[in-house]
């Protein structure tokens, strides 16, 4: 294989990755969420959502209501949490404050929030409201993130397919 063919393959791979990145960023802008698609990682929302379900988020509402399923992140943790709003009210500045709980959990989420935080702030902590889902399709990402052998096998297969693939 000459240098021109190698450059063509590299450019094709680069364009594919750049297109995926632009699609993700475009989706982030449309949904107003830095993470418009998330995978359920635990069973805390069963039976509504199972581990491995892919959730589609929308963050253009000004307020959430009791019963909405939201995804939030707090300062202390970088993993998005999917739970239902069980209580809401406004602070003295008019900002919406939310209390959440997993459908399959006995207690609310106050213990998951940051230090000295009793409620989530709608304008600060919420990633988005769940608007749709695909069941079980997220298991691939769970497998890759939890199993280093699966991660290396997937990376190896992708590398081999890009090197050996023909036009």
From Swiss-Prot:
SUPFAM superfamilies: LexA/Signal peptidase. Belongs to the peptidase S26B family. The chain crosses the membrane at residues 7-24. The active site is at 44 (charge relay system), 83 (charge relay system), 109 (charge relay system). Its EC number is 3.4.21.89. Keywords: Endoplasmic reticulum, Hydrolase, Membrane, Protease, Signal-anchor, Transmembrane, Transmembrane helix. InterPro entries: LexA/Signal_pep-like_sf, Pept_S26A_signal_pept_1_Ser-AS, Peptidase_S24_S26A/B/C, Peptidase_S26, Peptidase_S26B. PANTHER family: SIGNAL PEPTIDASE COMPLEX CATALYTIC SUBUNIT SEC11. It holds the Pfam family Peptidase_S24. Catalytic component of the signal peptidase complex (SPC) which catalyzes the cleavage of N-terminal signal sequences from nascent proteins as they are translocated into the lumen of the endoplasmic reticulum. Specifically cleaves N-terminal signal peptides that contain a hydrophobic alpha-helix (h-region) shorter than 18-20 amino acids. It is an enzyme of class 3 (hydrolase). Component of the signal peptidase complex (SPC) composed of a catalytic subunit SEC11 and three accessory subunits SPC1, SPC2 and SPC3. The complex induces a local thinning of the ER membrane which is used to measure the length of the signal peptide (SP) h-region of protein substrates. This ensures the selectivity of the complex towards h-regions shorter than 18-20 amino acids. SPC associates with the translocon complex. The C-terminal short (CTS) helix is essential for catalytic activity. It may be accommodated as a transmembrane helix in the thinned membrane environment of the complex, similarly to the signal peptide in the complex substrates. The keyword Electron transport does not apply. It catalyses: Cleavage of hydrophobic, N-terminal signal or leader sequences from secreted and periplasmic proteins. This is Signal peptidase complex catalytic subunit SEC11. The keyword Protease applies. It is found in: Endoplasmic reticulum membrane. Residues 153-164 are annotated as: C-terminal short (CTS) helix. One of its GO terms (biological process) is protein targeting to ER. One of its GO terms (cellular component) is signal peptidase complex. Residues 1-6 are cytoplasmic. It is a single-pass type II membrane protein. GO terms for molecular function: peptidase activity; serine-type endopeptidase activity. Residues 25-167 are lumenal. It comes from the Eukaryota.
């Amino acid at each position: 294989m000459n240098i021109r063919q190698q450059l063509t393959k590299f450019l094709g791979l680069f364009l594919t990755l750049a297109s995926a990145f632009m699609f993700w960023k475009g989706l982030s802008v449309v949904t107003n969420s830095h993470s418009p698609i998330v995978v359920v990682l635990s069973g805390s929302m069963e039976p509504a959502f199972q581990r491995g379900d892919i959730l589609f988020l929308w963050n253009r509402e000004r307020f959430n209501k009791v019963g909405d399923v939201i995804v939030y992140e707090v300062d202390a943790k970088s993993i998005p949490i999917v739970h239902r709003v069980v209580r809401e009210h406004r602070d003295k500045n008019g900002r919406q404050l939310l209390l959440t709980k997993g459908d399959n959990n006995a207690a609310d989420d106050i213990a998951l929030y940051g230090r000295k935080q009793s409620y989530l702030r709608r304008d600060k902590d919420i990633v988005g409201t769940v608007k749709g889902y695909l069941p079980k399709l997220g298991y691939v990402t769970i497998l890759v993130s939890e199993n280093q052998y699966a991660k290396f096998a997937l990376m190896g297969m992708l590398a081999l397919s890009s090197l050996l693939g023909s036009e």
